[in-house]
Structure formats: structure tokens, C-alpha cells
């Protein structure tokens, strides 16, 4: 099968979902750009989302909350985070009730960090030098996403937008101590260009959305390479549910960046080899748009799929027909 034929196969998978009409999710004001959505681990089906203060960044909006907890109905439960994050990008809700948010914004002495909040909105841990750059153990040149393993070990994807030569995965202990890092800028195995999203399956395998390379790379938790998957398109966001179903948001494919592929949400069972079984196309698509459209962040619970959108500045909900 050629690359073009493979793309057409993934583009033509059935779509058993429809969008909930209108702006979904009440946060008390207009939505800003958002690429960060996750599901609470307490069985409630509640949704965590971090958005960019009604704009595409929180700088100059220090009195505006950026982290929200929503019920499946869209009703607001709580919000916090004002003045702490310049550009919320990735979010992860851990099994102990912690909520982690990555900051890809930067100014002197602030940003390029990962913050852990408790349920009261208090910062209880921060990883990364404020405003730091470079590739040192605690310096992040754009931390795109965060995932915490059941063991408590912390994985951070570094290199938002493929900046410089700092494209890597870093691993920290549960108390924030550096353990190791792997990867460098490039197109080969163990190389990344804009590692944009992280997820983990029930076997503890780490999935890295290597966006600019149009692939997902799979690793064990020691950084040993396992496989490369290209069938999910150009991955901006990843989510794996409790049944090992992988959800991938492709917000950037076009004829220049990923020829033959369409933007949208691809869904496939990991236990079935990761073949795409569902494709929710991006209805806002400009076929050759150079920016981003549709879902960039992705999560799912109780039969619904949630897509966090940067371009349209909203959280979109999809339900089964």
C-alpha cells in the first residue's frame, strides 16, 4: 500500500459521531484558544481544560483564570490559575487528584515550566527554570505536554513548534527529581521534531505525538524504542482511554505538511494493532490552510469526545449518533 493509499484509507473510516451544536462548556466568559483537555480520574466524567485567558495567551491578563473543571453537561464546577501561566498548552489529571499544566509561553523570569495544582487551585509542585531555555535537566524550550505514570513518574515532552535543537522527552520522579531524557532534533528513530503530545496505555507504553514528523513513536518507560505509527496522521493531541482506545487529534495536515491526509480526529483500538476505525473530519477545514483548525487537544469519556480548539477558540463536544 502506498502512502497515499494509506492516507485515503484513514480518511474514509466511518464517523458515528456528531457535534453538539453551539459553544459547549460554560466558563463565565468567551473562550480563548485551547489545546489542553483531560478527564478527571475520579469516575465523575468531569472534564479538565486549560485555555488562554480569552485570547491566545495570558500575558496581560493576570486576573483571569485559565484552568477549568466542567461537568459532562458543560456546567462549570470550579476555576483557578490566574496569574500563573503565560500560555497553557498541555494538561494532565493524575490519579491522586493533581492537575498538571504546561506553559509554552515565556518572558523574562516566567514561563517554560510545568505546574502541578491541587484541587483547590494551589501550586504544589513546579518543574523547570522560570523563563529558562536550553536543554539542561530543568530547562525547557517549550514544554508541550505532560503525563504521569501510575508509578508517579513524570514525563514531559519538550520542543513546542520544534524550537531550536531542544526536542526530547524528559523523565522525573514523583517528587520532581530528574531521572533521564532521550531524543534529539531529527527525523530518525529516537529523534523528534515538535513532540507535541503524550499518552500511556494500560501496559505502560508511552506514546509520543511527533507532530512535525507526522508520526507517533512508542517507548517503554525507560526510553527504549518500540515502534512507529503513521496511521493517525499528524498528531497534535493524544488520549488513551481505559479500554486502550487511542484518540488522535490532527489539526495541521494539508497538501504541504502531510500530503493526502485530512484534518480531524482518528480513533483506533491499540489491541487491534492501532488501525483507525473512526474518523471525525474537521468541518472547519481550509484544505490548504497553513495554520491550525479543528481539535488540537483531545479527550474522551462516557461515549463522548472532547476536542480543544486553538483556531476557533472553543471546546467542542462530539456524541454518538
PLM segments and residue spans:
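Eukaryotic scaffold repeat domains enriched in small/polar residues
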Residues: 4-321
Amino acid at each position: 500500500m502506498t502512502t497515499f493509499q494509506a492516507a485515503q484509507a484513514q480518511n474514509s473510516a466511518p464517523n458515528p459521531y456528531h457535534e453538539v451544536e453551539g459553544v459547549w462548556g460554560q466558563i463565565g466568559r468567551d473562550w480563548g484558544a485551547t489545546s489542553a483537555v483531560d478527564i478527571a480520574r475520579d469516575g465523575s466524567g468531569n472534564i479538565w481544560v486549560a485555555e488562554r485567558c480569552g485570547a491566545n495567551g495570558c500575558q496581560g491578563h493576570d486576573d483571569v483564570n485559565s484552568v477549568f473543571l466542567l461537568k459532562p453537561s458543560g456546567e462549570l464546577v470550579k476555576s483557578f490559575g490566574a496569574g500563573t501561566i503565560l500560555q497553557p498548552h498541555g494538561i494532565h489529571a493524575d490519579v491522586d487528584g493533581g492537575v498538571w499544566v504546561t506553559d509554552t509561553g515565556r518572558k523574562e523570569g516566567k514561563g517554560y515550566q510545568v505546574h502541578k495544582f491541587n484541587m483547590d487551585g494551589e501550586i504544589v509542585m513546579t518543574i523547570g527554570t522560570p523563563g529558562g531555555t536550553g536543554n539542561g535537566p530543568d530547562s525547557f524550550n517549550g514544554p508541550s505536554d505532560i503525563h504521569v505514570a501510575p508509578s508517579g513518574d513524570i514525563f514531559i515532552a519538550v520542543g513546542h513548534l520544534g524550537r531550536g535543537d531542544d526536542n526530547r522527552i524528559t523523565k522525573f520522579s514523583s517528587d520532581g527529581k530528574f531521572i533521564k531524557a532521550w531524543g534529539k532534533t531529527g527525523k530518525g528513530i529516537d529523534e523528534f521534531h515538535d513532540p507535541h503530545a503524550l499518552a500511556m496505555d494500560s501496559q505502560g507504553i508511552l506514546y509520543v505525538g511527533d507532530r512535525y514528523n507526522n508520526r507517533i513513536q512508542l517507548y517503554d518507560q525507560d526510553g527504549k524504542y518500540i515502534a512507529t505509527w503513521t496511521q493517525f496522521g499528524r498528531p497534535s493531541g493524544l488520549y488513551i482511554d481505559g479500554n486502550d482506545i487511542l484518540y488522535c487529534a490532527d489539526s495541521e495536515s494539508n497538501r504541504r505538511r502531510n500530503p493526502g491526509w485530512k484534518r480531524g480526529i482518528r480513533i483506533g483500538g491499540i489491541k487491534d494493532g492501532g488501525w483507525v476505525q473512526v474518523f471525525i473530519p474537521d468541518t472547519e477545514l481550509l484544505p490548504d490552510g497553513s495554520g491550525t483548525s479543528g481539535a488540537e487537544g483531545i479527550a474522551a469519556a462516557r461515549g463522548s469526545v472532547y476536542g480543544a480548539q486553538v483556531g476557533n477558540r472553543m471546546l467542542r463536544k462530539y456524541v454518538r449518533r
